[in-house]
Amino acid sequence: MTTGHQLAERFAETLTAHDLDAYSTLLHPDYVNHNRYAEPGKAGSVAIFRAFIDACDDFRAEVDDIIDAGDTVVGRYTYRGRHTGTFLGVPPSNAEIEMHTIDIWRVRDGLLAEHWDELNTLEVFQQMGAIPALTLA
């Protein structure tokens, strides 16, 4: 049976390869995603990554750390890419973006079954030029 560690590694590999069909095979049929930007279920999770890949043609996901605790796996990732397409209504800026995430999954039946994450979305939208950078003045 596939371990949580293997699933978390494969997650990054499939996204970097822009292979959302392979990514979808990692998700349990009853997948629950607690990410507020994604629609419910497997389809919603695939759609949010489709949006990233479409907006950043060189989108890649790098594994920073994985902690496997049996039925729970935690991954820290860095996503990088050049913002060349519209993302969540933000027009292309051609800026290099970098997003850091902490993803927590519940593993069931050898698949990713439930997901929570923390993202630096404020910084991402600042990098895209959607909102001004904050300064200490």
Q: What do these predicted ranges mean?
A:
Residues 1-137:
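C-terminal and inter-domain tail/linker signature
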